[in-house]
Amino acid sequence: MTKLRDLLSFLAVICATFAPITSLGDVPVLQLDRAEFVMDDGELPPPDSAAWKPQSLPDNWNVSRPQASGFGWYQIRFVLAQQPMQLYAVYAPKISISAAFYLNGQYLGSGGAFTPPATIARNANRPQFFVATPQLLRSGGNTLHVRIWSAAGVGGIAAVQIGPEAELRPLYEHRYLLQVQFQQISAALIGFVAVLMLFLWTRRPQDTMHGYLGGSCLAALVHVALFVVRDAPLPGLWWDVLCLTALGFSVAFYALFVLRFTGRRRRSFEALLWLYMAMNPFVVALVGLKQYGLIIAFESLVFFVLFVFCMGILAQFWWRRRTVESFLVFSVLVFDLILGGHDFGIFAGTVPFESMFWTPYASALGSIFIGGMLVNRFVSNLNDYEKLNVELEGRVVQKHAELEEN
């Protein structure tokens, strides 16, 4: 009974952590979901005479302007009954890829490096929060300008909130915890499992399952870096190309793991997987710098095709064996497929743009469960081997004693 109570308490804490929180203050927080938009390369907010067009928020560029890339400006007007006396803040739960904010013509801040394509901060997975002093606001009409830069197919901005800093900061910190810090922890867990599996493989090279799972986790770690690394170590969009290519590597290595786990040998299919991994970086590099969204669509297609293939093999294997291990691997695959579909839906516009990406969590949970299963199998085999050695030594001693008696 105590264990059940502890489990329910733990689940309650998890649900409370992931549940959205809302402002409860006396001063209302404004939800700004109406804007005007114009593509413009200027470094300062365009004048009112620019070719502004009405735009509702959230705005997913892959839906509203799928081929657009470069700089765009949002002009968001709002009204305050009076000039505030306390600190205010501007909070954007999600922007892509990076943005700078101007309030009534004054620069508020940006998410980091903003000189594309050479250097650009990756903020597609980071909420934006900027404090505004009362002097920047006025009674009556106010204007917030947001300058966005994005590659084709991945730009966008969620509805923006403005209100007292004390009211908006908890919303920002809650989102930052889930969207950045927890995903950084997930990346660390994936890296740990990758190192552990590759270490076991070096100790027993004949157990290629460990090597393939380690390779899958290592590639998944590189892919998850796209979500958690803001300042890319490579110039331009080459960092994005590397991280997106890693998704294909991760799934291909996982398919090889599934074949070894189920005892299947399909040499022609395995050869295709190795050919795909050899050619994928070159294909992505050729088109990735201009068609970012196309790369996401291509890698997602490979992801779904290989996962469905693996699900078919695992379903047959589980139906024949009915083991806990086979059910666990199959369940992890289904879980990853669902969360991967959710994240692809964000790009496709079928899932709300402001939704968080769940792929890092899927990769972490899958790595932990399957990695733990293989470690348990490795330890069990080691224990059986040691037990067999003890039994053999006992038999040798017994036979030696019998020979001495004779």
Per-segment meaning from a language model:
Residues I21-Q67, R77-V79, T143-H174, V195:
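Accessory carbohydrate-binding/adhesion or oligomerization-edge regions at the termini
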